[in-house]
Curated annotation (Swiss-Prot):
It comes from Moorella thermoacetica (strain ATCC 39073 / JCM 9320). GO terms for molecular function: double-stranded RNA binding; metal ion binding; ribonuclease III activity; rRNA binding. Keywords: Cytoplasm, Endonuclease, Hydrolase, Magnesium, Metal-binding, mRNA processing, Nuclease, RNA-binding, rRNA processing, rRNA-binding, tRNA processing. Belongs to the ribonuclease III family. Homodimer. It comes from the Bacteria. It catalyses: Endonucleolytic cleavage to 5'-phosphomonoester. Its EC number is 3.1.26.3. InterPro entries: dsRBD_dom (IPR014720), RNase_III (IPR011907), RNase_III_dom (IPR000999), RNase_III_sf (IPR036389). NCBIfam families: RNaseIII. Residues 162-231 form the DRBM domain. It is found in: Cytoplasm. This is Ribonuclease 3. Digests double-stranded RNA. Involved in the processing of primary rRNA transcript to yield the immediate precursors to the large and small rRNAs (23S and 16S). Processes some mRNAs, and tRNAs when they are encoded in the rRNA operon. Processes pre-crRNA and tracrRNA of type II CRISPR loci if present in the organism.
Length: 233
């Protein structure tokens, strides 16, 4: 790696104010298969992408498990998927200008590869993988939580006073039809009932919520659905 490239990567990493990492690994994370092929390099970022995908999933799953103790597994799964999906990764990559750092083959470069969503998402996962290999799980966790702060803050926002109205306003602003609430389960004696509500959009279950009354369960379902829709953007 020449000095210019090293300075470029060092500048990128310093913005996070985290312990130093192996810049060779970061460079590999930004190496597209077409570049590796054209320059006869022994590796590209695909294996790091595989590793980073697993690390990202674990970090986000742990965060959701700790911050949403009342949510069932199905909602946690949907929330994790919203955070780690390609669209979310691309948002992060563009905010960090990862495309400027990619090493691409000539054909990929000339066909818009620096802004191609799949390239940006793959590179973000590969970067996470390289951080994990360089500094271990704790450093990778700190990195992931920092770069995904906007998405995680949306999920953690419990300030929706009237979550049902807020959800309805949001879906109407997107030009879609009204949401529908259904009580999916109820249990317990009359003096201590528990309810599970689901909120549906176009017959698709968005999220569920639990409560001691039907209205409380519906509000919790609306809050979870609103967070998911905002993250998916």
């Amino acid at each position: 790696m020449d000095n210019k490239r090293q300075e470029q990567l060092q500048h990128f990493w310093e913005q996070f104010h985290l312990p130093a990492i192996d810049l060779e690994g970061l460079d590999l994370a930004l190496t597209h298969p077409t570049y590796a092929f054209e320059h006869h390099l022994p590796g590209d970022n695909q294996r790091l992408e595989f590793l980073g995908d697993a690390v990202l999933g674990l970090v986000v799953a742990t965060y959701l498990y700790q911050h949403f103790p009342q949510l069932p597994e199905g909602d946690l799964t949907r929330m994790r998927a919203a955070v780690v999906c390609e669209a979310s990764l691309v948002k992060v990559a563009r905010r960090l200008r990862v495309g400027d750092l990619l090493r691409l083959g000539q054909g990929e470069e000339h066909s818009g590869g620096r802004e191609r969503p799949s390239n940006l998402a793959d590179a973000m996962e590969a970067i996470i993988g390289s951080v994990y290999l360089s500094g271990g799980y704790e450093l990778a966790r700190d990195f992931v939580l920092q770069i995904f702060t906007p998405a995680l803050e949306i999920l953690s926002d419990t300030s929706f006073i009237d979550s049902k109205s807020a959800l309805q306003e949001f879906v109407q602003s997107q030009g879609t039809e009204n949401v529908v609430y259904k009580i999916l389960e109820e249990w317990g004696p009359d003096h201590a009932k528990g309810y599970k509500a689901g909120v549906f959009l176009k017959n698709r279950l968005l999220a569920t919520g639990l409560g001691h009354s039907k209205k409380e369960a519906e509000r919790e379902a609306a809050r979870a659905a609103l967070a998911l829709l905002k993250v998916q953007g």
